[in-house]
Amino acid sequence: MCLTAAPSRVSPVAAAAAAAADVAGSSESTVNLMADVDKKDPQYKQIFLERFRKKLQSDKTGMNDLESFVELPEGVAPSAASIGPIKRGSEPLPPWLKLKVPKGMTHRPRFNRIRRSMREKNLSTVCEEAKCPNIGECWGGSDDEGTATATIMVMGSHCTRGCRFCSVLTSRRPPPLDPEEPEKVAAAVHEMGVDYIVMTMVDRDDLPDGGASHVCRCIHTIKEKNPALMLEALVGDFHGDLKLVEQLAVTPLSVYAHNIECVERITPRVRDRRASYKQSLQTLEHVTKSTNGKMLTKSSIMLGLGEEEKEVRQTLRDLRTAGVSAVTLGQYLQPSRTRLKVSRYAHPKEFEMWEKEAMDMGFLYCASGPMVRSSYRAGEYYIKSILKQRQSAEGGKATAAATAANAGAAIA
C-alpha cells in the first residue's frame, strides 16, 4: 500500500455529506429538512445531501452548487458529487513519488512528543501547514535514535502573501503577534530534545518591519534556553529592506535560509508580486557580505513549474555568485486544486544531475531529489558537520591567539 504526496482522493459524496452534516448540526432549519426521515435509514446521508443541495440553490446565499460549499477532490468534476463514478482528470503520480505508509508512525515516542508539544503551546509547523510529504520521516526520525527535525513556523498561521504554489493560509490582516511566542517556541524546542531545529515564518507585510524584530527575539530566546542547539532560520525578504535582513544575520543563527523558489522567468507567475528573483538574490548576497562570509546561507529551487534546463543551471550560478553555501532541489507537487498545476515530473536521474552540477559549482552542500524540501532532514547531517568544522576552526584560531598573547606577556 502506498501513500502519495498528492491530495487524498475520498468519496465526494462522503466528503460533501460530512460537511453538510456539520452545518446541519448548527442549523435548526436545516435539521428540519430531515424531519420525515428515520436516521437509521441506510439512505439517510444521500437523502440529506440531495435536500441540502436544493436548499442551497433555493436560498439567496450565492452558493448554487456543492462545489461552492465543499472542496472536491482533485480531478473530480462538480457533477461527480452526486452518485456515480468518479472521473479522474489529473495525471497519476510516477512510481518514485509514491511513499510507503510508515508502520506505527503515530506510536513513535519522538513523533508524538513533537506533535504534542506543538499542540499544547498552540504553535504552527510548516510541516503541517504546507502539507509536507516528509513529516513522518522528519518528526519520527529514521528510527527513534536518529535525528528528528521539525520546522516551527512563527508569527501565526496566516501569511500576507499569496504565492501560487503554497498551501499556507493567506490574509491581508492576520491576527496580532503573540508576545509570548518566543518563550513558547524556546520551551517547545527544549522539550523536543533535538540538536538541530529549523524556524520559518509567514510573511507579515502588515507590520512595519515585516516581523523582523519578533523573529530576532525568537532566535535569541531559543538560543538562551538551548545554547548548544544548531538553529536554522528560513525567512522572508522583509520588503527588501537590507537593514532588517542584516538585523537577523547578526543573531546567533547557524544557517540563514531564504528560498528563491524557482527560475527567474516564471517568478511573476509562481510567487507573490511583492517577491522577486533579484530581491531574493540581494537578500542572500547581503547576508554573506554583512557577516564576512561567516554565516552559512541556504536556498531552495522547485522543479516542475515550467522551467527549462538552462534556466535551472543559471539559477544555481546566480545563487553561488550571491555566496549561497547550500542548496536544495525538489519536485513541486500541487497542494490543492486552487494552486498551480504541475507542468512535469522530473525523473530522479535529473535530480542526481543537478546535485553533481551544484557541487561542481562550489556549493558546500546540495540535497536534490523528488521528495526533497528546503528543510528536509537528510541535509542537516552534512550541514551539522560543516558547522562543527567551522566552530572547531574558530575555536582553534581563538586558542592560537590566546596562546600567542600569553607567550608575548611572558616574554615582556
UniProtKB/Swiss-Prot annotation:
GO terms for cellular component: mitochondrion. It is an enzyme of class 2 (transferase). [4Fe-4S] cluster 1 binds at C127, C132, C138, S375. Binds 2 [4Fe-4S] clusters per subunit. One cluster is coordinated with 3 cysteines and an exchangeable S-adenosyl-L-methionine. Keywords: 4Fe-4S, Iron, Iron-sulfur, Metal-binding, Mitochondrion, S-adenosyl-L-methionine, Transferase. The keyword Nucleotide-binding does not apply. It catalyses: [[Fe-S] cluster scaffold protein carrying a second [4Fe-4S](2+) cluster] + N(6)-octanoyl-L-lysyl-[protein] + 2 oxidized [2Fe-2S]-[ferredoxin] + 2 S-adenosyl-L-methionine + 4 H(+) = [[Fe-S] cluster scaffold protein] + N(6)-[(R)-dihydrolipoyl]-L-lysyl-[protein] + 4 Fe(3+) + 2 hydrogen sulfide + 2 5'-deoxyadenosine + 2 L-methionine + 2 reduced [2Fe-2S]-[ferredoxin]. Its main location: mitochondrion. Residues 142-364 form the Radical SAM core domain. InterPro entries: Aldolase_TIM, Elp3/MiaA/NifB-like_rSAM, LIAS_N, Lipoyl_synth, rSAM. GO terms for molecular function: 4 iron, 4 sulfur cluster binding; lipoate synthase activity; metal ion binding. Its EC number is 2.8.1.8. [4Fe-4S] cluster 2 binds at C159, C163, C166. Pathway: Protein modification; protein lipoylation via endogenous pathway; protein N(6)-(lipoyl)lysine from octanoyl-[acyl-carrier-protein]: step 2/2. PANTHER family: LIPOYL SYNTHASE (PTHR10949), LIPOYL SYNTHASE, MITOCHONDRIAL (PTHR10949:SF0). This protein may be expected to contain an N-terminal transit peptide but none has been predicted. Belongs to the radical SAM superfamily. Lipoyl synthase family. This is Lipoyl synthase, mitochondrial.
